[in-house]
Regions:
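N-terminal glycine-rich phosphate/pyrophosphate-binding loop and immediately adjacent elements
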Residues: 1-96, 100-105
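Conserved redox-cofactor binding core of oxidoreductases
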Residues: 100-199
Length: 199
């Protein structure tokens, strides 16, 4: 089986198919960088890790799209927010667009599976002063406020303060491997089952 892309979709597909005994080859056009190569220099990382050097737009220029052009795709360059598709969107897809599988229990089990493997949690969360003020202000105004779950895992031996500082740089690649994107999770699983990656 040839899988094109190594991000959120490709990584999961590769791991599941390899575990099922399929011979899997993952084709990725983007670069691979080791953790130590994520230097947190904004322009260099954007130029290296993002499709179109971060300037990818729709044909009419009305929408800017930030897409990963690296091993792990968007899971390498996202900000680690990991929330489920809202129920109202799933209902719309099922009822108005003829895709009933979005409401099937197996689909929800898929969310559970991915969240477990990606260590999705709100426990490793600390608001900076700006976000804390926004959170508190919204609560005082009567808005419902919730923390956004993130796919993060504290690394043993990593200074907790360094962990928190590094989170601000996670869209530029995670130098410590705390963000549990495709490279840290599903691609490792796929490789352990014999899958291969072709750059």
């Amino acid at each position: 089986v040839v899988i094109v892309g190594s991000g959120a979709g490709g990584g999961v597909a590769a791991a599941v198919l390899a575990a099922a005994g399929q011979r899997v080859i993952i084709v990725e056009k983007g670069v691979y960088r080791r953790h130590r190569e994520y230097n947190q220099r904004e322009m260099e990382m954007i130029n290296t890790l993002y499709e179109g050097k971060g300037l990818l737009t729709s044909v009419d220029g009305g929408v800017t799209v930030l897409a990963g052009n690296c091993l792990g795709g968007g899971t390498t360059v996202n900000w680690a927010g990991a929330f489920r598709t809202p129920d109202y969107v799933l209902r719309e897809c099922a009822e108005e667009h003829g895709n009933p599988h979005f409401l099937h229990p197996d689909y929800q089990e898929g969310f559970d599976f991915v969240e477990r493997r990606n260590a999705v949690t709100t426990e490793l969360l600390r608001h900076n002063p700006q976000n804390a003020a926004l959170y508190e202000g919204a609560e005082r105004l009567g808005y419902r406020v919730k923390d956004i779950p993130r796919n993060m895992k504290a690394r043993p031996g990593l200074d907790p303060e360094q962990f928190w500082r590094d989170q601000g740089f996670s869209p530029l690649g995670d130098a410590n491997g705390s963000k549990q994107g495709s490279v840290e999770t599903f691609l490792r699983d796929a490789l352990a089952q014999g899958a291969q990656i072709m750059p």
